[in-house]
Amino acid sequence: MKKGTRKVVRITTLVLITALIGVTLYFNLSSDTQIVEAGDDYIDFELETLDGDIVKVSDLLENQGVILNFWGTWCKPCQEEMPDINELYNEFDREVEVVAVNVRESNQQINQFLNSLPEEMDFTIALDRERDVTRAYNVGPMPTTIAINQDGTVVKKQESQLSREDIVAFIESAQE
């Protein structure tokens, strides 16, 4: 290759790499997605439920605190903690609202998962098909559970399976 051709190839490669870095930075830094952590105000959302209704956090917060539990059908810890969440939800006379947010799975997968559990779940199953809510609440591993008190403050977040003691702590935090 001639010296002049090599120089053109190097400059073109450098320009392309710089452009790719610029585009990547632009899309990552210009995102208007808010990420919520403990201590922040909640981000409101509307999601369709497995029953075909719409659930909206702000409507639920009018009467009580809310616990969001993000889960997937493939998640063994999710399967293990759900019956405990349901049992304690009922033991506490539903003093907080529990919304189990499934991430990107079909109704068939969800129903098959729920049917494999030892009992029927009494709380709301919401469907985050586009992962908008999952991203807004900065959910990484599943299960992830978030407690929001009635004032609309995220008071607790855990990115792992909840023990029965953890579930009680989440319910009590959401009641503050």
Regions found by a protein language model. Give the residues of each.
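N-terminal targeting signals for export/organelle localization
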Residues: 1-46, 176
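A generic structural signal for alpha->beta connector loops
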Residues: 44, 64, 95, 122-123
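A short beta-strand-turn-helix
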Residues: 44-66
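Conserved beta-strand termini and adjacent loop/short-helix elements that scaffold enzyme active sites
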Residues: 50, 57, 101, 126-128
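Short pre-active-site segment immediately N-terminal to redox-active cysteine/selenocysteine motifs
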Residues: 64-66, 71-74, 141
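Hydrophobic beta-strand anchors of alpha/beta hydrolase catalytic cores
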Residues: 67-68, 98, 145
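Structural microenvironment flanking redox-active thiols in thiol-disulfide oxidoreductases
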Residues: 79-117, 129-136
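Thiol/disulfide oxidoreductase modules built on the thioredoxin-like
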Residues: 115-121, 128-175
